[in-house]
Structure formats: structure tokens, C-alpha cells
Amino acid sequence: MDVSSLPEEAALGARFYDEGKEGDALEILKKYGANSLRIRLWNDPYSEDGKPYGAGTSDFTKLVALASAGKKLGYSYLLDLHYSDFWADPGKQFPPKEWAYADANALEKYVYDYTKDVLLKLKRLDLLPEMVQVGNEITNGLMWPHGKWDNVDNIARFIS
């Protein structure tokens, strides 16, 4: 159950109900059998002048808040590392703006360092995920052009 947008939805006024009674979305989901969450992480989901891109603004702060709330309710979670600043899917796989001009060798190092940094921060917070998804919907590769689908050697380097 991907809950990455819940904080933004709540901030915009969304309310969640169970049989007509307002409640916490995670508690309602738990009541009906949900036991694991999917939380996405975008590298830097903000414009150059600091405005959020929206769609959940899935940054590290939101990840920690959702993982903490889920942990309190007994959820496990999958961390989805997009390696992008916004949506990555089969039709577009843009590297984070900070990595935009990197070559494949640099991208390999950036992915490794970023992944390690995120996981070490989560470990210090006692919020390590049960599963990690490297990339999002990477059918056609990731971090184009260096990781486009026809460059399988680079894709393997980036995700191993």
C-alpha cells in the first residue's frame, strides 16, 4: 500500500473515514488487514527556488514521518528509491538534477553513496525498511541516458 502522498493529502484537507467516522488513514488501513507500507523517496523534490514539485513531495523528512507512524502501528515497509527528483516510470527516467551532468562512472558512485547514506540515516533512527526497491518501474532502465534499457551493463552497475 503506497502511502507516500498521505502527508500532503492531509495538509490539503483530505479526511479519511471508516463507516462514517473520521480516523487516521494508517489506522483504518490496519483495521482492514494492511500490514506493509510502500514509501517512495525522491532525491530532491524541490525547484531551484525551494518550491515543492508536489505529488507528495516525497523527501527524507516525509519518509521518516511515515515510517515512524507505520512502525508505531506495527507495519513493515518497503522503501522505493527513485533515484530521481520526481516521478520515474517507464516513459521517463531522469536522474536527480544534482547528478544530471554525471557520466556513468559518477552515477554508479552517486547511487551507491546515496543509498548507503539513506540507509545509515534510517538505521540510526531505528527505521530500516524490511525491503528496498532500487529504482521505480525500471522496465526501460533508470537515470537516462546512461541507464536506458539498451545499456544493460550500466543498469547492472547502477542497481547492484
What are the residue ranges of the model-derived segments?
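Conserved, mostly hydrophobic/aromatic
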Residues: M1, L29, D80, V132
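Catalytic domains of carbohydrate-active enzymes, especially glycoside hydrolases
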Residues: E19-D44, L78
